């Protein structure tokens, strides 16, 4: 996504 950190949180 636009934010990698946000992606990690999703996983």
Curated annotation (Swiss-Prot):
The alphabetized list of GO BP terms reads: neuropeptide signaling pathway
Which compartments does it reside in?
A: Secreted
Query: What top-level branch of life does the organism fall under?
Result: Eukaryota
Keywords in alphabetical order, please.
Answer: Amidation, Neuropeptide, Secreted
Phenylalanine amide occurs at: 11
List the GO cellular component terms: extracellular region
- For the keyword Secreted, the answer is yes
By sequence similarity, the record places it as follows:
Belongs to the FARP (FMRFamide related peptide) family.
- Its protein name is FMRFamide-11
Instruction: State the organism named in the record.
Output: Sarcophaga bullata (Grey flesh fly)
């Amino acid at each position: 996504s636009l934010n990698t950190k946000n992606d990690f949180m999703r996983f």
